[in-house]
Amino acid sequence: MPAPKPPAFETLSLHAGQHPDPVTRSRAVPIYQTTSYLFDDADHAAGLFNLERAGHIYTRISNPTTAVLEERLAALEDGVGAVCTASGMAAMHLAIATLLSAGDHIVASASLYGGTINLLTHTLPRFGITTTFVKPRDLDGFRAAIGPKTRLVVGETLGNPGLEVLDIPRVAEIAHAAAVPLLVDNTFATPYLSRPLTLGADIVMHSITKWIGGHGIAIGGALIDGGRFDWRASGKFPTLSEPYAGYHGIVFAEEFGPASFIMRARAEGLRDFGACLSPTNAFHLLQGVETLALRMERHMHNTKAVLDFLRKNAAVDWVLHPSLETHPDHERAKSLLPNGAGAIVSFGVKGGRAAGRKFIEAVRLSSHLANVGDAKTLVIHPASTTHQQMDAAALAAAGVGEELIRVSVGLEAAGDIIDDLAQALRASQKA
């Protein structure tokens, strides 16, 4: 008898990780709003604390509602396990703290989320961890930057702010040749557009606040373990390959095999750092996961319509998106992102900083704020907001022109989005 066909992405989005409550028979995932869980007896408690059996002890470490979200994300990303955190930045910090120690080194793409850049540039050096940044298209640069103390390579599926498409298979090859794992932030793509673990990455990170949650109502992060990196053979990761006194001398690579990284991240990281996701936020984010495929299809449809409009508008100097033939990574996007290259569009408004400010102040339907990945269309002009303290030269050095407008394309009717952008562009050109 042939093996059953694995469920499709849309089906996993709705069903993975959940077994309906046998007592209440609730079809929806319940919110287990509790801090702690009853033990059957002393032996049961001891087994849980020694990591000898599955179960819940305290919601800082695990929770039944959050566990459904974790298992579902692991299924969507083709991983062996996941840990959810209070935010995307908590997930990034947790990954690094699980693998690296003082004296270790990271090689990272220079096109990363600003919070990640700040963590790597300013915060981690205080703890003895340094980073070398490399342009995301510079494969030789990645190779040259890896040294004897390098323990992690970091990149984003779609870079920020240039929307560079990371060549995940080739960067993974470079990292693995040095016995180092590749961590990819897949926030901008979501597993609907890209599954980095299937392309060679070892760990995937998300700010699930963004498109996965999709509605701007809950903050959360996630780490997904691909389970394919051999931590013991590498010889560079004592946190996984050597006895850990914090859990009675357990060797995570021996006890948990392919899931050793994600188990250490949970057992030590959530226990000691405490950046756990609340069960209520896990519930809210699960609602987003259930409609992820449908929403991403609409995001891609609307993004194409917005791009077609912007390219023809006389008030626009340039448009940036990997789906456009003018983008340097267009061919790579077609290969690695066949379902679409994300819902972030950048463009330059004629008239520079002053015109950009007029545009932002003229939008009516679009929301002027600093988030991305909402169901609603969001816009921002960095030169008059997030980067307003910089002059033209400093902005250029940061890759943020005075004329740059960033649009996170939402789910409204495409015609309504375009009408709003059109009237704001007209306003931007008035004296």
Place the predicted regions along the sequence by residue:
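Short hydrophobic/aromatic beta-strand micro-patches
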Residues: 224, 346-348, 408-410
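Conserved N-terminal alpha-helix of the aminotransferase class I/II PLP-enzyme fold
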Residues: 41-93, 115-123
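Glycine-centered tight turns that cap/initiate beta-strands
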Residues: 78, 149, 315-318, 365, ...
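N-terminal "arm"/small-domain region of PLP-dependent enzymes with the aminotransferase-like
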Residues: 2-63, 71-72
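PLP-dependent enzyme catalytic core of the Aspartate aminotransferase-like
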Residues: 121, 130, 148-151, 295, ...
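Conserved small-domain helix->loop->beta segment predominantly found in fold-type I
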Residues: 273-276, 281-282, 287, 291, ...
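Conserved PLP-enzyme active-site core in the AAT-like
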Residues: 2-3, 13-15, 19-22, 82-312
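Short loop segments at secondary-structure junctions
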Residues: 36, 226-229, 349-352
